[in-house]
Regions:
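Extracytoplasmic "Venus flytrap"
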Residues: 36-55, 71-75
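Beta->alpha turn/N-cap motifs
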Residues: 45, 69-73, 83, 88-97, ...
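A conserved helix-loop-strand patch within extracytoplasmic ligand-binding domains
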Residues: 110-160, 259
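Ligand-binding "clamshell"
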Residues: 98-110, 124-125, 197, 202, ...
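Pocket-flanking alpha-helical
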Residues: 73-104, 119-121, 126, 146-149, ...
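Periplasmic-binding protein-like
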Residues: 111-121, 145-154, 209-274
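Short helix-initiation/N-cap motifs at beta->coil->alpha
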Residues: 68-78, 165-193
Length: 274
């Protein structure tokens, strides 16, 4: 990843780790005082299988988890802000920060889940070196994931970003493009399905799998895991961080049964982040 990113990533990682450590000081109770049901917003697909296991783990502590499935990245936060769900689990900190800035949400992270390294995929090329001059490369068009995609392209030498452009870099921050690649901005859910119309595409793992892409054979590059700021987490409305059910929910996710479920559902591409 870009050398300029290391400091900000480390600071972000430490800040989040500290916040979650503080939340974790109170051990999750063996059972809740009364049976309680919580609604958790997730994005449909492989994560539905993972959350079935989370629900089983939560039930052991008296917490009933009902998932509410959405089909894009905007709805889960809208629903959480309105109170239509009690928590959600689908996003990383750069995405939430941008949503708070642009939409004024009152949402906070409470526990890490997993990280899905974003990858560069192609049906036409077998390596980055095979990409021709003028190659058309698709990237997600939402601010946080576009910056993430551009950093991947920089990490493999396809472009260079302006120093200090950070994790919210845009195409306007490209200062060198030796192969004259053409960046095509598409909705995160569309970019993977457009792979046959592109030379390559940077696709989030969940959307890659939904689009029929195979990380083992179609992925020609991926972002590093070290100091990765894109760890996903469970989030709740501000003011509920220390509710007993929140601690129970986080504990229900952060265990070996869910590690196994992640490995099975995502074929090793979903890496536990706690």
């Amino acid at each position: 990843m870009a050398r300029a990113m290391c400091g900000r990533r480390s600071i972000l990682g430490l800040a989040l780790a500290s916040a979650f450590a503080f939340i974790g000081l109170a051990v999750a109770p063996a059972s809740l005082a009364a049976a309680e049901t919580v609604r958790v917003g997730i994005v449909g697909g492989e994560d539905e299988d993972v959350w079935k296991v989370v629900a089983q783990q939560a039930a052991k502590s008296g917490l009933t988890v009902k998932t509410v499935v959405f089909n894009d990245y905007t709805q889960p936060n809208e629903a959480l802000e309105r109170g239509d769900v009690d928590a959600n689990a689908f996003q990383h900190k750069p995405y939430l920060d941008n949503q708070i800035k642009t939409r004024g949400y009152h949402i906070v992270p409470v526990g890490f889940t997993a990280v899905w390294p974003i990858g560069l995929y192609s049906h036409k090329r077998h390596s980055v070196a095979d990409l021709p001059k003028g190659a058309i490369i698709g990237v997600p068009n939402d601010p946080s994931n576009e910056g993430r995609a551009l950093i991947v392209l920089q990490s493999v030498g396809l472009i260079k970003l302006r120093d200090g452009s950070g994790i919210l870099a845009t195409t306007a921050d490209i200062v060198a493009n030796p192969k004259d690649v053409k960046i095509k901005e598409l909705d995160a859910g569309v970019v993977g399905r457009s792979i046959d119309d592109l030379d390559a595409a940077v696709v989030n793992t969940d959307w890659a799998l939904k689009s029929g892409l195979k990380p083992d054979t179609d992925r020609i590059a991926q972002e590093p895991l070290a100091d990765n700021p894109y760890r996903n987490f469970i989030a709740v409305k501000a003011g509920h961080e220390n509710d007993a059910w929140v601690k129970t929910l986080v504990a229900a996710y952060q265990n070996d049964a869910v590690k196994d479920a992640l490995a099975k559902a995502y074929h090793g591409t979903g890496v536990p982040a706690w």
